[in-house]
Amino acid sequence: IAQCLVGSEMCIRDSFYTAMYHLLIHPNIIQDVNGEYPMMESLKVGHTTGNRYTVFSLWDTYRNVSTLMTLLYPEKQLDIIRTMIDMYKESGWLPKWELYGRETLTMEGDPSIPYIVDAYMRGLRDYDIETAYEGMRKGATTPGEFNLLRPDNNDYMSKGYVPLREQYDNSVSHALEYYIADWNLSLLADALGKKEDAKLFRERAMGYKHYYCKEFGTLRPILPDGTFYSPFDPKQGENFEPSPGFHEGNAWNYTFYVPHDIKGLAKLMGGQKRFVDKLQMVFDKGYYDMANEPDIAYPYLFSYFKGEAWRTQKLVRELLGKYYHNAPNGLPGNDDTGTMSTWAIFSMMGFYPACPGDLDYVVTSPTFNKVTIRLDEKFYPKGELVIESARKTPEDIYIKEVTAGGKKLKGYTISQDELVNAGTLRFTLENKH
């Protein structure tokens, strides 16, 4: 927990360190003192000389926990990724939601891909990436009837989307997870020199456009014959009621979950203004669900557009104040093995990874006047990152200027390399936007 030293604002500080504690609960070590552990999907006993981990809630953690572990605890992150690759070697599949050596198949998607790729793209590479890629490609290309991770892969590969075949089959949610996984897989394929694969998976990742319905301005389930599902209510699914096409949410919770192509989604919606107005409406009308992973990065999407970053800064501060407290109800819901807490950690420090695999963070106004991050010099030679905020009053929540290592940022993003080599990240804040 002492990797980050924050300011003296007592209540906020306690919430921050509580979130850090939550981050580190899972995954947890499973091997015994002699190195023995239960092998994946087997009655056999394996042996390790390192650390073997368990409890992989990957549908949640690929969104932000992977990035934070790579930044703060790279050595542990390496052991976690090596464990995931060993699980593939033992069972034939990368994990989706592993629990003590068993695959629960909870939630959807192919989340090991973005979890590992994000770490790889950020420079963490001391593991067998070719075997990892083999496992990723298997999940992405195996026909559905033989595919543990993507049971509806036949439709996805042939049509570019997953049609709704049963009333509550979560088809749109499945496809959206495949799109972000395939986009990440295209990044890795490109990095490994597998150009044809990179092209294939990059094209697949754009399939979300099939679901966009101009009539409602949201994503909408598609039937096997290619027509949109009817009758359709984009609000159906509120409060976890069943919803055709969507898992634990509704169309508004999922429509903006195309983190790898936000500008493309905005173009579908009719341009920047319509995108921003629609996204703002999600917050104004209470459609946003802080406890639902697919939309937790929504506040940061405004910053992709010129002149709109103030909305990010305002909303993030409001959400932190509303949902995170040093009290029994101090979380927006199930912490999902650190995912909700990680949102708070990043947001309090002043930067957030809005898209897994993308090396840029979106910046926002930090909660603290000073944060010191102790970076592992084995991985980040600079050794320390100090985040400072210059403000006159607590109402100064809007960014006037950000400098990294004395150099002014041109926009509202900072790359991984800029961040870890900055030494000092300094925010000048004001009370107007």
PLM feature spans:
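Single conserved hydrophobic/aromatic residue that forms the stacking wall/gate
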Residues: 1-7, 12
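N-terminal core-entry segment
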Residues: 13-61, 65, 72-143
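Structured loops at beta-to-helix junctions and adjacent beta-edge loops in soluble globular domains
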Residues: 22, 26, 119, 301, ...
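Detector for glycine-centered tight turns/loop "hinges" at secondary-structure junctions
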Residues: 35, 91-93, 217, 226, ...
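Active-site core of glycosidic bond-cleaving carbohydrate-active enzymes
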Residues: 48-63, 71-73, 113, 123-381, ...
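C-terminal beta-sandwich/jelly-roll accessory domains of carbohydrate-active enzymes
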Residues: 391-433
